[in-house]
Structures are given as structure tokens and as C-alpha cells.
Amino acid sequence: MNIPSDRFMIPCHLMGPHFSPCAASEKTGIQFYKQTEVGEIEHIGKRKEIAKVGHASFEPPLEFQQTENPYIGLFWMIDTLTEHIDTLRSCGADDIWIDLGVVSHLDVKLEFEPDFLMKLANLKIPFLISGYIETADE
């Protein structure tokens, strides 16, 4: 496995017109860092709107992100979703996706083992990958 010298950002986003982040968190133990229930007031820029969909986001706990191997957090995310995907869907999460951000000073080569790719494929969710160049002042 090729390990980049920099870091990953690994948020998972969930949403749906009947999705309840509170129920999902209660049933799975997942701690969302951002969540909105259907019907709550949302601040969108300077406007306030009533949320038509429930949505939430979560990331691996810090101990899985702050390691020499940035893949550890990604493995945690896949394992957590594998364990809880049915419960999240039963709580109304119709749309679930992982948005991997790779932050680097240089070019990065990502390498995924077949077992990891099979686990990811079995989730049947989108997996987005974006690259970001970190400059000296960041």
C-alpha cells in the first residue's frame, strides 16, 4: 500500500427527506459534527430556511485521523459504514457518500487493496476523491 506523506479528510455525508440524524446517532452511536433534522431552521448564508431534508456529516475520531498512516481513518469509515449502513438507511438516509479529500504538498499516488475495494463496493455508495495542494502558509 502506498502511503502519502500528507493527510486525508474523510467526511461521510448523509441526507434524505425522512432522515433523522438524532435517531441515527442514537441507534448507531455515530457522533455527527453537523446535523439538521427535517423541519429545523437552517442558516444558508444570510437567509433562514426550513430544512426540507435531514442531513448530517461525520468523520473518523481523531485517534484514527492523527496517525502516520492516513489510510487508518478511511478503513475506520468503511468498517463503520459496513456495520451501520442498514440502520442509517432505516433512519431515512437515502443518499450516503464518502468525500475523500487528499491534502498534499506534492503529487500523490493512492493505492487501494482489492479487499478494501470490495468492502467499498458492497456499501453501494458514491466515493468521491478530491486533491488539494497545501501551501506553506496553510
Give short role names for the model-derived ranges.
Residues 1-138:
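Acidic (Asp/Glu-rich) sequence patches and key acidic residues
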